[in-house]
A protein has these predicted regions:
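Gram-positive cell-envelope targeting signals
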Residues: 1-32
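Detector for Asparagine
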Residues: 2, 7, 26, 36, ...
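Intrinsically disordered, low-complexity segments enriched in Ser/Pro/Gly/Ala and basic residues
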Residues: 3, 21-24, 77, 133, ...
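Generic low-complexity, intrinsically disordered sequence content enriched
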Residues: 9-10, 22, 27-28, 63, ...
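Extracellular modular ligand-binding repeats in secreted and cell-surface proteins
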Residues: 30-101
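Solvent-exposed, well-ordered loop and adjacent helix/strand elements within mature globular domains
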Residues: 96-225
Length: 225
């Protein structure tokens, strides 16, 4: 073999060996740096959130809702000191302890000019703030502190106290939310005979859309104010 060629091959092997050693050294250095970070500054510990139950007599016993979603916390060690990376947030579930709130019955509709209604359109119930609501002056909606803009309902207040929030579902009304602010003789008499009748307020008797729907479900979302 040519001596010059042999020397060239030897030099090439030495060069490749140097590259391999250099690469290994850099890789090893990277491993050491990573190990140091994990070992001293980035040792993380997950702190699992807990579930806290709160009981509310204003909610029907058939309702359970999440008030606050839970978030796991994260802590880490830095120079021997435990620090918080993410604060733990406990999950909060509200459970109803009030009366069971599912009913079936009939939905009727009425205007403030109905027979026997207050001539000024005032409802039977006072609002949460103690004021009086007029269907003719203030309209057929009420701004509830929890549910926002809702329709006004008339119901038997011995069963559905003033301020009760009800969701109405039937073939014409899908998920309508209303608040009990009124009552009437028809609701009282219906309850005494064993069935549920709730009246939905309209601007006038002439604007009533549907005289009666006897296949209506009523879901109480909150009992009273």
């Amino acid at each position: 073999m040519n001596v010059s060629l042999l020397n060239f091959i030897v030099k090439m092997f030495e060069f490749l060996a140097l590259i391999v050693v250099s690469l290994f050294s850099n890789f090893k250095s990277t491993i050491v740096e990573y190990t140091n970070v994990i070992g001293t500054n980035e040792v993380k510990d997950v702190v699992e959130y807990e579930t806290v139950y709160k009981y509310n007599s204003k909610l029907p016993s058939n309702i359970e809702r999440v008030v606050v979603e839970g978030v796991d916390g994260i802590t880490y060690e830095s120079n021997g000191e435990t620090k918080v990376l993410v604060e733990k947030v406990d999950k909060v579930i509200e459970k109803g302890t009030g009366k069971y709130g599912e009913y079936t019955g009939a939905l009727t509709e009425y205007g403030p000019d109905c027979y026997g209604c207050d001539p000024n359109g005032y409802t039977y119930c006072a609002t949460k703030n103690g004021t009086w609501h007029s269907l003719t002056k203030d309209g057929i909606y009420y701004e509830d502190y929890e549910y926002g803009k809702v329709r006004i309902l008339a119901a038997y207040t011995g069963e559905f106290p003033c301020g009760t929030i009800i969701e109405i579902n039937n073939s014409e009304k899908d998920g309508l939310i209303g608040v009990v602010l009124d009552t009437g003789g028809g609701m009282i008499n219906a309850y005494r005979t064993g069935w549920t009748l709730i009246d939905l307020a309209y601007e006038s008797q002439s604007s009533v859309e549907m005289p009666i729907n006897k296949k209506t479900s009523f879901s109480v979302k909150r009992w009273g104010w």
